[in-house]
Amino acid sequence: MAGNSFGTLFRFTTFGESHGPAIGCIVDGVPPRLPLDEAFIQGFLDRRRPGQSRFVTQRQEPDAVRILSGVFEGLTTGTPVMLEIVNQDQRSRDYGEIRDRFRPGHADWTYQAKYGIRDHRGGGRSSARETASRVAAGAVARRVLETAPAPVTVRGALVQVGPHRVDRARWDWAEVERNPFFCPDAGTAALWADYLDGVRKAGSSIGAVVEVVASGVPAGWGEPIYDKLDGDLARAMMTINAVKGVEIGAGFAAAELSGEENADEMRAGPDGQPLFLSNRAGGILGGISTGQDIVVRFAVKPTSSILTPRRTIDTAGHETEIVTKGRHDPCVGIRAVPVGEAMMACVLADHFLRHRALVGAPGPVGNGGPVEDGDPVGG
């Protein structure tokens, strides 16, 4: 199967299925002599781990990572880093009824159409279980970013669940780690809890929007035309399971703005570098970073596995009905937050190495950081 690798210089390949023995990744292009151990990677995996609240799948996986290669005495060696996560809580019996039936909204039919065979247990390779491997790769990417000329911070938050959006006037990054939703607003988190309890008890699911922000990225990362930084970020987010839309900066809202409103004006900063008065561009112009915060949002569709009976067909082409059993996320967007962070880190690590290889030194540091406190996009 093609399409299992991502990146150019910093490149990772993931492997494994939802109910297979293990999942993991091989990360290539990691510079030597970077500190890396399992405890560092585990910290990021624990944020994504299932079973931590009633609002996510109750599959109990410790997601304990093992470093199998590429590290010696706590430092990377410059050779491929292989990371393994053993699956420990598969319940394949829950999926016996779908061996010969295609679940609406899942990749069952498309995998069968392409390969003539599919692993029906938990979705196999198409399961969101694969994203744990990306989070592990993202941890390695963060070590690469630590060698950049200035600190690069990648943070994510859930900003919408169903019709309910966060109150950006109350945005607090510290609040993200205090609730089970990665929500930057305590009031909205409480509302989401009540809302999702109703969704969960009904056996249904709901979509969400995730926002990922990178601060401290110097001006100059990215390439023009076909290798744009925002192009790679959009592709990265679209590879995440259940993601159906991506926007950068003002994104689709830019269609409603005038040219005067949309273009980010500049003043001269004390260091002679531009000081942007807004960040509608989301930190990228012409495919190259501006030095401002890079702001990406992506929409996650509702989990397709629900208890409501749905019409479908079986492998013989007969119409039938299906109710999906198993342990599923009522809102898969919650655990997509650490995954989005990981993909942002991987793209930035790749472009950092590419920029350094091309010009020999990083670009100048711009005026990064939020334009207004609590609002990464600004206005």
From Swiss-Prot:
InterPro entries: Chorismate_synth (IPR000453), Chorismate_synth_AroC_sf (IPR035904), Chorismate_synthase_CS (IPR020541). Keywords: Amino-acid biosynthesis, Aromatic amino acid biosynthesis, FAD, Flavoprotein, FMN, Lyase, NADP. GO terms for molecular function: chorismate synthase activity; FMN binding. FMN binds at R125, S126, S127, N241, A242, G286, K301, P302, T303, S304, S305, R327. Its EC number is 4.2.3.5. Coiled coil: none annotated. The keyword DNA damage does not apply. Pathway: Metabolic intermediate biosynthesis; chorismate biosynthesis; chorismate from D-erythrose 4-phosphate and phosphoenolpyruvate: step 7/7. It holds the Pfam family Chorismate_synt. It catalyses: 5-O-(1-carboxyvinyl)-3-phosphoshikimate = chorismate + phosphate. Its cofactor is FMNH2. NADP(+) binds at R48, R54. One of its GO terms (biological process) is aromatic amino acid family biosynthetic process. Homotetramer. Belongs to the chorismate synthase family. This is Chorismate synthase.
